């Protein structure tokens, strides 16, 4: 795969994942206790022997830059690199990135210098494990100009995706980005042609783009130069290219989740605790997911009841109950707490004993979960300070609420406590 260049799209402002994107770029959002979203496509690239990788971003990229530079530092003995390219203003391009295609266009001067045959364009907010070598080989075998990775989906989620129709040879003959109403119904197909059984085909009568593309190098450069007013791959570049180019579909038949919303992010993380076999597993030695080595001590569990949960390294868990939850690195849970259906992202550092005691003397909660606290159906962002006897249970069953001044939001009924938030003793949410 030395002839392939990887391009990962960092996405926009991450409004659907807000407030998790308040202080970080979307690809830098923590995942599964110890990873970040960006680790998924980068690891897939490395496992597929694609070692030349650019990541395009423009919002809150400081923590993403730090993570990439500390994690994916290829040695000087290979051409391999992983580099973040932030949006920039120039005389030729005075505006920020206007869309996915525009982001690639603004750096096309850099991309075209590489002596490669194909570009693989990836998204930074998906959870899946994929061998891109098979995907690229299919692209080459069919003589395609562009190949899209696709999945069959049902009617409920179909309007959120780019949908297509294909012929008997897998060629895309029609493409519609996020259709609704009659336009949606018009995109129904018999997905048995993809190998689904009749029952599955009935449940999933649409073919959706995963937002993952392989382009012949010159085809991509030509498309970007010809349509300078076209800023988005899904809405403009792909639908127009399907008319004049050989655009092929590649069926991906394993687990894949778009985790661009708070609800999808929450469900994907807690889905990792599913028994006996989760839909996605980080325990695969053949295709591991890489992240930064932090050299943390083992987790300390002191007389706790922990069931159906993932506990990351470096945690301190006292006499408490934890069920169906994910605890991130350096999470601290004090005695008599109940944590259920919750993702706790952990902390960036440990507070020394003296500082924790000083916080308690001043009436300010230290980092972690205080004694006697109950948390259900929530996401607790990093470095949050949850006081004693706090109830984070969405008592009023609120679906949406913006209480940033109090340190939390509610999204789709899920309470999201902000990074660095302070929730005082006795608070009820």
Swiss-Prot record:
UniProt superkingdom: Bacteria
A GO term for molecular function: structural constituent of carboxysome shell
Keyword ATP-binding: yes
Keyword set, alphabetical order: ATP-binding, Carbohydrate metabolism, Glycogen biosynthesis, Glycogen metabolism, Nucleotide-binding, Nucleotidyltransferase, Transferase
Gene3D superfamilies (alphabetical): Hexapeptide repeat proteins, Spore Coat Polysaccharide Biosynthesis Protein SpsA, Chain A
UniProt catalytic activity: alpha-D-glucose 1-phosphate + ATP + H(+) = ADP-alpha-D-glucose + diphosphate
SUPFAM superfamilies: Nucleotide-diphospho-sugar transferases, Trimeric LpxA-like enzymes
Residues reported in the UniProt entry to bind alpha-D-glucose 1-phosphate: 162, 177-178, 209
Entry EC no(s): 2.7.7.27
Pathway stated in the Swiss-Prot or TrEMBL entry: Glycan biosynthesis; glycogen biosynthesis
Cited Pfam families: LbH_GLGC, NTP_transferase
PANTHER family documented for this protein: GLUCOSE-1-PHOSPHATE ADENYLYLTRANSFERASE LARGE SUBUNIT 1, CHLOROPLASTIC-RELATED (PTHR43523:SF12), GLUCOSE-1-PHOSPHATE ADENYLYLTRANSFERASE-RELATED (PTHR43523)
HAMAP family in the record: GlgC
Protein name: Glucose-1-phosphate adenylyltransferase
Organism: Picosynechococcus sp. (strain ATCC 27264 / PCC 7002 / PR-6) (Agmenellum quadruplicatum)
Gene assigned in the entry: glgC
